[in-house]
Amino acid sequence: MRQSLALCLFIAGSLGAAAIGSRFMTGEWYAGIVKPSWNPPNWIFGPAWTLRYALMAVAAWRVWCRAGFGGARGPLGLFAGQLALNAVWSWLFFGRHRMDLAFIEILVLWAAIFATLLAFRRIDRPASWLPLPYLAWVAFAGVLNGTLWRLNAG
């Protein structure tokens, strides 16, 4: 029962971070900027991010199950930090329309996700595999962010 409740809390926390970030999503500004031909359709972002946040939550939960909060303070701190960075990216990109700062921030976010993955690996190897789609998506999002910045500069 305790583990099930903890899993629900990890998922709720992750989806809470997603909800904060989604407050700044798309809208007229994004619809009006120049996009590359390979830009994904808007409808894909919601389901894709939800799945990735859920996988990250399960990974963090697995780490907690193996080491507890005391034994996994560092890895779980990294987990919380990268969730916060993800929300900041949404605010910079969609809320402030600062593609330049968002690009720099997404590089930091990617590094934070990678550090989280490595920290999880020391405690629970399968937990380090679950964030791989998230890491790949953020790499893609970084390339897209950089391309959008270049196409819309000036």
Regions found by a protein language model. Name each.
Residues M1-A12:
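N-terminal membrane topogenic signal
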Residues S14-E28:
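Alpha-helical transmembrane segments of multi-pass membrane proteins
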Residues T26-N39, L151-G154:
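Membrane-interface helix termini and inter-helical loops of multi-pass transporters
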Residues P40-A54, R96-L109:
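Membrane-interface loop-to-helix entry segments
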Residues A54-S90:
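Helix-adjacent hinge/juxtasegments
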Residues W91-L101, W149-G154:
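Membrane-interface helix caps and helix-loop-helix hairpins in membrane proteins
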Residues F93-M99, A115-W129:
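Membrane-helix boundary connector in multi-pass membrane proteins
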Residues P131-W149:
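Final/C-terminal transmembrane alpha-helix of multipass membrane proteins
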